[in-house]
Amino acid sequence: MNKKVLTLSAVMASMLFGAAAHAADTRIGVTIYKYDDNFMSVVRKAIEQDAKAAPDVQLLMNDSQNDQSKQNDQIDVLLAKGVKALAINLVDPAAAGTVIEKARGQNVPVVFFNKEPSRKALDSYDKAYYVGTDSKESGIIQGDLIAKHWAANQGWDLNKDGQIQFVLLKGEPGHPDAEARTTYVIKELNDKGIKTEQLQLDTAMWDTAQAKDKMDAWLSGPNANKIEVVIANNDAMAMGAVEALKAHNKSSIPVFGVDALPEALALVKSGALAGTVLNDANNQAKATFDLAKNLADGKGAADGTNWKIDNKVVRVPYVGVDKDNLAEFSKK
């Protein structure tokens, strides 16, 4: 009897151990360029949430702390731990080739997301994909939003010269999103027949505190009373501008951002932010996770999903957000 009990216990323990092993038999390695980036924090949490719905997946999540060398080391460790796919938010897009060579050495597929590698890098490995956006689209939509509100608010034209005197807070120089948003927001305004005059343009590296400091300096400078519109490449910098304008009693100056972060949507609701552009964190996260899981399981990247892959790339569309359609994007 005791032998039977012991045997049964051993079998059950073996089954439980097997189930536990099976429950995490698909390891996916993830690196985020830095955890304290507002937008990437939302993406990271969304990926973690998606993974909870897939009990056979174990995420190995890493904070690269804005250090490409650190990220390279993290990828080496992930590969040594036997991950079946990599999901990589690059620190430096130029490092994609290095990451691909590491992945190729272990025959592991890699899904880059948010920071786009070069076409040459993607084409160099048949198991490399990218999930992101069309960077210029966000600039165009931001330009459309500004044009819409400029036409509806004649009081914004402080000197009545018919052109927008603007300052622009730029993201990381060289980052595809920063370069495209900076170029295309102004191009779209000009294409719509709206003349523009740049008073100031400088980087605040996607950061709220840096943007506040930059805006403080501009509001203390010789062009302070000429500023009619503040344009920011992302919401984090837009929020810094809003803080600075409030401190200088100039909250009536309109500010436009990109990302549609929850905090930014609250500012749109209050009127402190004139508009933003939805950079769809949840769908970027879901597409990244879906592709990585499929590839880890040996399936086609988009199998069983609604994602459309064009030349190894999934593009998640942007949407303009202001008070007129805010209810569609605010959490119920």
UniProtKB/Swiss-Prot annotation:
Phenotype for residue 97 to D: Improductive interaction with trg
Subcellular location field: Periplasm
Residues annotated to bind beta-D-galactose: 37, 114, 175, 177, 181, 234, 259, 279
Cystine bridges: none
Amino-acid positions noted as binding Ca(2+) in the UniProt annotation, renumbered to this chain: 157, 159, 161, 163, 165, 228
GO biological process, one term: chemotaxis
Positions bearing the site annotation: Interacts with membrane-bound trg signal transducer: 97
Family: Belongs to the bacterial solute-binding protein 2 family.
Function: Part of the ABC transporter complex MglABC involved in galactose/methyl galactoside import. In addition, binds D-galactose and D-glucose and plays a role in the chemotaxis towards these two sugars by interacting with the Trg chemoreceptor. Chemotaxis requires MglB, but not MglA or MglC.
UniProt-recorded name of the protein: D-galactose/methyl-galactoside binding periplasmic protein MglB
UniProt source species: Escherichia coli (strain K12)
